[in-house]
UniProtKB/Swiss-Prot annotation:
Biased composition regions of type Low complexity, renumbered to the chain: 699-709
UniProt source species: Mus musculus
Enzyme class label: hydrolase
Binding site for ATP: 178-185
Protein name: ATP-dependent RNA helicase DDX50
Family: Belongs to the DEAD box helicase family. DDX21/DDX50 subfamily.
Residues spanned by motif DEVD box: 287-290
Record-listed Phosphothreonine modification sites: 244
GN (gene name): Ddx50
Positions of crosslink type Glycyl lysine isopeptide (Lys-Gly) (interchain with G-Cter in SUMO2): 122
Span of domain Helicase C-terminal: 377-521
Length: 734
């Protein structure tokens, strides 16, 4: 006999069942109680939701009531859903045709409904504060735009977008600064599109642009235009820059433009020819404003927009300035374009670190002659054969030479100003799609390239200004991902490195070149992954040969040799972990107690080793904490030193990675072990400060050279400081 709770519901589904008079009366009482309970429950629910009970509302259909009861959180609904347990379903098997299926369907609906409520509650609990603040429902964003944003993978607004949406949407002037990779383009694109679509007028042919976005590079202009196009289907977006056809741009002007993005040079050309009318501008955006208002672009920007601005007029276009780096001079120069009352959003502010917080900054000391080979090793260890990397060089010639570097095993392509625009676009498209893994570029790729999959950025030398370093390193670690930036330097460039640390608020981790073990591990992983692409049919052809190899060499040795050959690592040439020079091995000598300087280590070496062995020791420097030293010896001498070393409290070893050291400076940058710096001492092995004549002379020369370099560097810095900043000069290193 079914339970009483189900009786009233199954009456419509079942054939009439025989029942006694007492059972019939009991059933009628139960139905009346249930009906009264349901009506009271619905009244309470309506009162809670609406504040008052509306007696004029039409009664809800029975199916709707049932759905509300099943999906609600009332005890009645929960009890009802409990009735559809597996045991109850098994008891209904004898019902007429269709009844079991109907109950099972209801059971599944109830279960899935409860599960969806639980999962939504759980999802709401796991939302971060950033996601809650950036929820689309908090902003005036249309459903159409939200759909397009989700198509781009954007599910909520990032902090810079949250902070700037209101001021931009309300038409206020704004200066905004945020770190690279935090979504600055959408910060102005989303509210501007919503504002234009809200006030959209009748679409006319040949209409003048209402929004002008100026960017310093073609690549950035292209990226910004794409971001606009991705989130609007109603507005016309055009992108003008050099190296492309004038005629196609003229056709776009004739058809009408709502949002114009471009570089100053090409837009100025269209203005001077009279083809482009900017008299109807309502919004002006300068992206990467620190570069747009610098001497290289400031005059062109002024020529383009000056007619749209009148002194102290509230009718001037809304002005929006965005960048990751905003020196103080930017604010001073920008005031002539801003209304007297403007908003300022700064997500960097007085924080020490100006660069992206998702990037790890490494520095490798390396002579320029060794750099191409070491860069190949760095790519292998930190990026692998599948990762994507960007290498920045200072000149176009360096870019071409680096891309042809035989030590770079991955396919690499060039990007610089002398390459035709059509080829530049093909190159960038291929890099985005992963057709090749390494992009070698000048500063044209430092700003605006938004490719989250970039794992590694390599700067072949410290850049000429801090802003360039920040923007270059910001090509990785984007959209919440982490990345690595490796900066190569020579001893004479230590001052530039320290200046970048100070101004960017970062600390470089000094590391050595990738060790042999690092390379073996990385290459073996790539080789193992490559085996997965071999088909079983191909494997069958090689089974006899494999069997012979196993019999001759053994399974492990045979496979190890095969992996070494596949990875191209059949031999390794040791390098100094200190200077990256070939043919040297770095060794550490750890002291049982703290030492004052390297002279203590020299004394211990002279006491335990032959003079011939000691004469090969070079580039000695203190370990962090003064608990020992590290130094280089020729590869041929490393085993002899270890064999001679015994009966000492000091521990001599060969490290796999460069330990933390006090900064090393090789005064003459020579790799000859007999030419010592001031720290390394003379041939007798004593300290250069107090040692033999040769060591002392070399030490004095080293220190004098250092002081001379400091004086020259000081004069250069003084010259830079005396330079006028009114035009937006950046801190340069000559």
């Amino acid at each position: 006999m079914p339970g009483k709770l189900l009786w009233g519901d199954i009456m419509e589904l079942e054939a009439p069942l025989e029942e006694s008079e007492s059972q019939r009366k009991e059933r009628q009482k139960s139905d009346r109680r249930k009906s009264r309970h349901h009506s009271e429950s619905e009244e309470r629910t309506e009162t809670r939701e609406n504040g008052v009970t509306d007696d004029l509302d039409a009664p809800k259909p029975k199916k709707a009531k049932m759905r509300e009861k099943l999906n609600g959180d009332t005890k009645e609904g929960l009890r009802f859903s409990d009735e559809f347990s597996p045991s109850h379903k098994s008891r209904r098997k004898d019902l007429p045709n269709g009844d079991v299926d109907e109950y099972e369907k209801r059971s599944k609906r109830v279960s899935s409904s409860e599960n969806s409520h639980k999962s939504s509650d759980k999802a709401e609990e796991t939302l971060t504060r950033e996601q809650k603040e950036g929820a689309f429902s908090n902003f005036s964003i249309s459903e159409e735009t939200i759909k397009l944003l989700k198509g781009r993978g954007v599910t909520y607004l990032f902090p810079i977008q949250v902070k700037t949406f209101g001021p931009v949407y309300e038409g206020k002037d704004l200066i905004a600064q945020a770190r690279t990779g935090t979504g600055k383009t959408f910060s102005f694109a989303i509210p501007l599109i919503e504002r234009l679509q809200r006030n959209q007028e009748t679409i006319k042919k040949s209409r003048s642009p209402k929004v002008l976005v100026l960017a310093p590079t073609r690549e950035l202009a292209n990226q910004v235009a794409k971001d606009f196009k991705d989130i609007t289907r109603k507005l016309s977006v055009a992108c003008f820059y050099g190296g492309t056809s004038y005629q196609s741009q003229i056709n776009q002007i004739r058809n009408g433009i709502d949002i114009l993005v471009g570089t100053p040079g090409r837009i100025k050309d269209h203005l001077q020819s009279g083809r482009l009318d900017l008299s109807k501008l309502r919004h002006v955006v300068l992206d990467e404003v620190d570069q747009m208002l610098d001497l290289g672009f400031a005059e062109q920007v002024e020529d383009i927009i000056h007619e749209s601005y009148k002194t102290d007029s509230e009718d001037n276009p809304q002005t929006l300035l965005f960048s990751a780096t905003c020196p103080q001079w930017v604010y001073k120069v920008a005031k002539k374009y801003m209304k007297s009352r403007y908003e300022q959003v700064d997500l960097v502010g007085k924080m020490t670190q100006k660069a992206a917080t998702t990037v790890e900054h490494l520095a490798i000391q390396c002579h320029w002659s060794q750099r191409p080979a070491v860069i190949g090793d760095v790519l292998q260890v930190y990026s692998g054969s599948e990762g994507r990397a960007i290498i920045f060089c200072e000149t176009k010639k360096n870019v071409t030479e680096m891309a042809m570097n035989p030590h770079i095993k991955q396919n690499a392509q060039c990007l610089h100003g002398d390459i035709a625009q059509s080829q530049r676009e093909i190159t960038l498209k291929g890099f985005r799609e992963g057709s090749f893994k390494v992009l070698v570029a000048t500063n044209v790729a430092a700003r605006g390239l938004d490719i989250p999959e970039v794992d590694l950025v390599i700067q072949s030398s410290p850049p000429q200004d801090v802003e360039s370093y920040i923007h270059r390193s910001g090509r990785t670690g984007r959209a919440g991902r982490t990345g690595i930036c490796v900066c190569f330097y020579q001893p004479r460039e230590r001052g530039q490195l320290r200046y970048v640390e100070q101004k960017a608020g970062i600390t470089f981790k000094r590391v050595g070149v990738p060790s042999t073990m690092d390379l073996v591990k990385s290459k073996s992983m790539d080789a193992i992954r490559s085996l997965a692409s071999v088909s079983y049919a191909a494997v069958d052809f090689f089974r006899p040969s494999a069997q012979r190899l196993i019999e001759e060499k053994g399974a492990v040795d045979a496979l190890a040799a095969a992996l070494a050959h596949i990875s191209g690592a059949s031999s390794f040439e040791p390098r100094s972990l200190i200077t990256s020079d070939k043919g040297f091995v770095t060794m550490t000598l750890e002291s049982p107690e703290e030492i004052q300087d390297v002279s203590c280590a020299w004394k211990e070496l002279n006491r335990k080793l032959s003079s011939n062995a000691v004469s090969h020791v070079t580039r000695m420097c203190l370990l962090k904490g003064n608990m020992g030293v590290c130094f280089d010896v020729p590869t041929s001498e490393s085993e002899r030193l270890q064999a001679e070393w015994h009966d000492s409290d000091w521990i001599l070893s060969v490290p796999a990675k460069l330990p933390e050291i006090e900064e090393y400076y090789d005064g003459n940058t020579s790799s000859n072990p007999r030419q010592r710096s001031g720290w390394s001492g003379g041939r007798s092995g004593r300290s250069g400060r107090s040692g033999g004549r040769s060591g002392g002379r070399s030490g004095r020369q080293s220190r004098q050279g250092s002081r001379s370099g400091s004086r020259q560097d000081g004069r250069r810095r003084s010259g830079n400081r005396n330079r006028s900043r009114s035009g937006g000069h950046k801190r340069n290193f000559d």
